[in-house]
Regions:
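Short pre-catalytic strand/loop immediately N-terminal to key active-site residues, enriched for Gly-Thr
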Residues: 83-93
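Conserved "HGTGT" condensation-loop signature of ketosynthase/thiolase-family condensing enzymes
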Residues: 1-84
Length: 104
């Protein structure tokens, strides 16, 4: 049996859009719009434009049926390298924690 040592993972930081009440400020924004804005803010903060990351993990509390492959579409909407793989997770109230556990 072949032993693979644990992979080193770095969670470099995070960004989010500001909180607001439901059905107010973000009513006309899509999940993709909001997630892409948060991801691009992270890319800008850490000067990652053009870089291919090992994985991008994004979370949404609720997704619409049109949000298929949401994280991948968001990566393509940023200045990250298009080859960067991505996945998203939906978990009400625990999305960020669950995503960090999966990545780490």
């Amino acid at each position: 049996m072949h032993y693979n040592p644990p992979r080193r993972v770095a969670i470099i930081g995070g960004r989010r859009i500001p909180f607001c009440r439901a059905n107010t400020s973000y009513t006309h924004q899509s999940n993709q719009d909001m997630m892409t804005a948060a991801l691009q803010a992270l890319v800008d903060a850490y000067r990652l434009g053009g870089e291919r990351l090992g994985d991008v993990a994004l979370g949404a509390v609720m997704k619409h049926s049109r949000d298929w492959n949401l994280a991948r579409e968001c990566v393509l909407g940023t200045t990250l390298a298009a080859e960067t793989p991505a996945f998203d997770l939906q978990r009400a109230c625990g999305t960020s924690l669950e995503t960090a556990i999966i990545v780490g």
